[in-house]
Amino acid sequence: MIKSKDDLEYYLKCDKVALKIPSNRFFPRPFFDLIWKYEIILRNTEYHKNNSGLFHKLLYYYNRIRLERMSAKLSISIKPNVFGPGLSIAHYGGIVVNPNAHIGSNCRIHEGVTIGATNGSNRAALIGDNCFISFG
């Protein structure tokens, strides 16, 4: 859970390493680093959701709109506070994760994956650290 600026920087750094982004690149390249951009927006949304105050609330709604637009563009549905640090999305397209799921750090997820609950229950998957999730 991202509660402070230090936590946000740590999560973003771990995600950047997991995506194998070169350390000398500080910003996502337009049209190329769409997954990295998605993860930055996701982490910023998590940060502002977990903090209180008018400033954080306004930025949460702004980032949530950006996240929903990017989710529709990439066909990825991941809600805030589901993944730990070190998230690596291999390819965009067809990724759906239940908002009640909790997945640990250093997770790599491929396209065509659905992590959900059964029979309409609120209980969802609890997946540990250092996992590789793929279709099949």
Give the predicted meaning of each segment:
Residues V17-P22, Y60-Y62, N81, I109, ...:
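Short amphipathic alpha-helical segments, especially helix-boundary/capping motifs
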Residues P85-G86, A90-P99, G104-S105, I109-E111, ...:
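Left-handed beta-helix
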Residues H56-N100, N106:
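Short linear elements at protein peripheries
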Residues M1-L74:
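Terminal amphipathic alpha-helical/low-complexity segments used for targeting or macromolecular assembly
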Residues F27-P30, G53, F83, G93, ...:
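Residues at structural and domain junctions
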